[in-house]
Each structure stands twice: as C-alpha cells, then as structure tokens.
Amino acid sequence: MCTPAGHPSHTQMNTPPSAPLERRAFLLRSSAALAATSLTGFPMIGSGKDAVQPLKIALVGCGGRGAGAANQALAADSNTKLVAVADLFPDKLSAGLDALKAKHGDRVDVPQERQFVGIDGYKHAIALADVVLLATPCSFRPAHFEEAVRLGKHAFLEKPVAVDAPGVRRVLAAAAEAKAKNLKVAVGFQRRHKKGFQEMIRRIHGGQLGEVIYTRAFANTPLRTGLVRKPEFSELEYQCRNWYYFSWLSADFIVDNLIHGIDISNWVHGGYPVRAHGMGALSERSPDYGNLFDHFAIEWEYASGARLFGECDRRPGCWASVTNHVVGSEGKADFFDGREVYSITGKRPWQMKTERGENPYQSEHDDFFEAIRKDLPYDESDYGAKSTMTAIMGRMAAYSGKIIEWDAAFASDRTLAPEIRSLADPAPVLPEGNGLYPIPVAGKTLVL
C-alpha cells in the first residue's frame, strides 16, 4: 500500500468493509494524477540533453544514506531538483526531507502529493523523475531497480544491490535492459571514485607489485545500537525499522560492510573468486540485535590461485580496522580508507598524498551526473552486482561451514527476501520463546 504522506490511509477512514480496495485504488490514481499534474511544464529528459534542462530527482528510502545521496546528487548538478520521495515510514520521510530542505531550499520541491508512504510508494516516486536514488534496505533493491529501468530512468543504487543470488540475477537482468536503453547506472562503491585508490590500482595493474599473491580486507568497526521495540510496532515493522540487524533486509554485516573491501580486491584481481570458505558466529545474543553474526573470517580463491582474506568484526572492544592490503611478489600496497596518504613498498616504492577532505561520496555523484549530461558511457551494475555476489558467497560459507563454489552460489534459488505486500504481512523470521531470533548454525544450515 502507498499513501501520500499526511493523507489518511483507507484503514484510517470511516468506510464500509467493502470499500477499502476501491478506495485505495482511487487514492493511488488520484495522488499519482495530482503529482503528475503538478509537474506539468517540467519535461522529462533523457541522456545527453542540454544542461539548461533541469533534471528531476526522486529519492526512494529517506534514511541517513538516502538523504546523504540526495544531498550529493543536488550538489553534483546545480540544475537539479528533488521532486518526489518515498519511504515505508512517514517519520523517516519527514526527517530526511526536512534535512534536505534546510540545506537546499526551494530545490527540494516535494509538496505533500509527491511524498509517498508505503510498500508501493517507490512506483509513484520513480514515475515522476529523470534520475532515481535507490537507498532502502537492499532486499528491496532489485524490485526498485527493475521499476526504474522499466520506466527509463537513470539510477543510483546504494550498495549492496541484493541480499541473495536470485536478487543479484534480477539486478543483472535489469542492467542488461538499462544498457539497451542507454540508461546510466551508478552503484555506491565510492572508493572507486577516490583519486588515491584509482592511482594505486593503476600501478598494481601496471605491475608495480609484480604478481599479486593475495589481498586482505578488513571491516572491523564498532557495533551500532539496535532499535528498541515499541509496543505499537508489528513484528514486520520492527524488523524493517531495525533492518540493519536482519539478514533478509541487510544481507548481514559481511555483505553490508565488508563489501567495500571485497570490491577493492575484485578490482585488483580484475575478476571474481571461484570459491570461498570460512567461519563466523554471534558472540552475544540480544533481542535488539536480530539474527546476524557479529564476526566473520573468510578466504576467497580466484581462478589464478590468488586469495582474498577478509575479516568483518563488530564485537565491542575488539581491534578496529577498515583497510585493504595487496601483497605481490615484488611489493606491498596499503589502502587506508579515510586517509590521504597512499603508499607502495618493495622494489619500486611510491607514495602519494591526495587533497585533504576529498569526499568520494560526492565524487561518485559528480561522475554520475556528468555522464548523464554528456551522454557518456556509465554502467557500474556489473561489478556492483558481482561484488555483492562475492560477499554473499562468503556469507554462505560462514553460515554453512562448507566450501562454496561461485557457480553453485550464483545459480542458487534459495532466497532470504520474500515479497512483502504490506506491513501487516507476517515477518520472514520470528523470535523464539526467549525473545531471541534463530541464527545460522555451521554444519546444519542449508544455503544452496
């Protein structure tokens, strides 16, 4: 269900029992028509159009990352406007919209009839824009991207792009259609837009380290606070609000966080692993922290025989590191996210300092909107989807305790993300009698 923010839904109105479906359909048709009418004279544009033409932006998912992406999109091109927003929850929508209005003023042109709340809100927001920013929990990303491509919209997809192999395949299929339509597709791997990372990769590919033997990636950061349940929340609403701690919504920490380091390793190797094995667990269970592991240690193997050793650790009080390291036959390269110094040691040492304050989150949107304006080739979907799949394969290995082959993982039909039609639907995972959620057990949990 989708309802314009601030408007009563059919369940809140005094109507006969036979009326809800008709009334909901009427509301959706009326709100969409009103929203479209209010944009008359503000024409849709495609790729490579005159920069004088304004670009209309829609934001789907108004939380912190979504509002951040909208802020960067508006900063990337001065002739853009945010014209529609959608979110599951009215409070999240309002908070994100208020923050954007405070910074960008009348460039945030989103009256109430273009604020959409509910499961289907994305459809109405996407229809009103030239460019869409997809920043909900990643279980919804495949469906949202499919809709954007169907309607011919350029799209920014926050990472990860899916929670399971069926979702990855859906994204790749939609990406093929996007390419045929000359749509620009960006994925939120901002490190690929950092000058220091780009230069380091160029040198590694040029042979400055000799043959790459292995890479290491760390995403060891403190645990964020879980959401305390309120009495008025249904089980599904609670999980959607506390999405970070449920694998069907976030894909688990290894996919949501370590994915950046995994993507850097794939970039270094110029391909994707053929298999993975490893382990993970949850050290301390709590009702507020869902059904995720809090640490992983995975080894991925590439076709060349090179390895990626990855760690993701969210346990409090443990060693923290967000870094990538590349070891070759003739040297070593160290990537420190957030620092401005990049270095290679070994036979051909090198060091580079980049401008302090470089913001890769902004750079990725600068590059994206430049490609739209100039009709440049721009498609980050392939590595966006396949680096997501690499991370999912690592999660499969930890959950199962098995060696997981790429081909089997990619072909798997086992899904974490059910189709949700309403927040009244049953939740995909339920707490046990002690209030704790069941977690995977290596050696017993099936992942293929």
Go through each PLM region and give its residues:
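N-terminal secretory signal peptides
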Residues: 1-21
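N-terminal secretory signal peptides and thylakoid transit peptides that target proteins
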Residues: 14-34
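C-terminal helical cap and adjacent loop that interface with cofactors, partners, or active-site loops
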Residues: 29-34, 38, 68, 260-273, ...
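N-terminal Rossmann-like dinucleotide-binding module
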Residues: 33-105, 265, 445-448
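Predominantly a Rossmann-like dinucleotide-binding segment in NAD(P)-dependent oxidoreductases
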Residues: 61-65, 180-186, 191-290, 298-300, ...
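A structured beta-alpha segment of the ubiquitous adenosine-cofactor-binding alpha/beta core
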Residues: 103-134
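Beta-strand-loop-alpha-helix segment that lines the small-molecule cofactor/substrate pocket
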Residues: 130-131, 138, 142-193, 207
